[in-house]
Amino acid sequence: MTNIRKSHPLAKIINHSFIDLPAPSNISAWWNFGSLLGVCLALQIITGLFLAMHYTADTTTAFSSVTHICRDVNYGWLIRYAHANGASMFFIFLYFHIGRGIYYGSYTFMETWNIGVILLFAVMATAFMGYVLPWGQMSFWGATVITNLLSAIPYIGTSLVEWIWGGFSVDKATLTRFFAFHFILPFIITAMVAIHLLFLHETGSNNPSGLTSDSDKIPFHPYYTIKDILGLLFMLLALMMLILFSPDLLGDPDNYTPANPLNTPPHIKPEWYFLFAYAILRSIPNKLGGVLALVFSILILMLFPSLHMSKQRSMSFRPLSQCLLWILVANLIILTWIGGQPVEYPFISIGQMASISYFCIILILMPATSLMENKMLKW
């Protein structure tokens, strides 16, 4: 008799995806982030569902309803902070996951990579709309500033912004629709994750050497299930320490002031995970130019397969490319720092230099270095 795991139509899908899946024998802890992102997504959907049971998407009561969740709902404070800090963990893992993909050349799986970039855009949109929901000062002004960027689009810009707002300013209609979109998007993301995995399982996982591993595969379970559970324990430890010891560490104090359209906060800034893109946006004095730079700073990820000039897939044996990648990481940290600073000297010029460096490293220096490494190896 055949094992039900291998014969039942539903169990068969799970078996081929998580149990009998052939996996390379040498994948490192950098391959843990995919499963951790899956756990984060599940955590966000579950905590978000419980928050939605008590939240009201109305300008007069939204702020009070969040306060009510934290004060009066059983473990409401825990659910709220798990959701807010869970989003931060989500982005930390996303950036690690993308960084690993760049380092080890995983972007050569074109379909998987491009769906991943679309997923990144969807997660960023979801996080932005979620930040608006508590209806604090930074929620309101963040929504106003970021949606206003669309007015830079020639001819249709102003009409488009008013259409998104549902009026002539960010108001009740905007909050209601943002809540609706914030609720539905994670389910769309879940469906896209399934497609992401579908394409990944067509090719199989990459590995640190960048070489094909068909001759040396091991079953996913128990080897990588145990490894993923260990990663999960570390994640939960970090997340619980963040929630229980300093839940507001990554938030903005201005968001504890109810939204007031008549009073602008001294410095409008998004959550920490958008600061690098915000710095790139602000570094260009022209509005349309800034918006294009902002979009292209993420969209540039889709160019990685075309910009790959090396004869080797992974950076494991390419020290010059490795140095350049770590310079890019340092550059992104500088951009994140600049995004949180006021628009004044010397931050403006530092931001402009870091923005130029960002695009130069990816578009010029990395391909040039790859070609140079090929020459050094006489390929």
Curated annotation (Swiss-Prot):
The chain crosses the membrane at residues 33-53, 77-98, 113-133, 178-198, 226-246, 288-308, 320-340, 347-367. One of its GO terms (cellular component) is mitochondrial inner membrane. Belongs to the cytochrome b family. The keyword Ribosomal protein does not apply. Heme 1 (or BL or b562) is low-potential and absorbs at about 562 nm, and heme 2 (or BH or b566) is high-potential and absorbs at about 566 nm. This is Cytochrome b. It is found in: Mitochondrion inner membrane. Binds 2 heme b groups non-covalently. It holds the Pfam family Cytochrom_B_C.
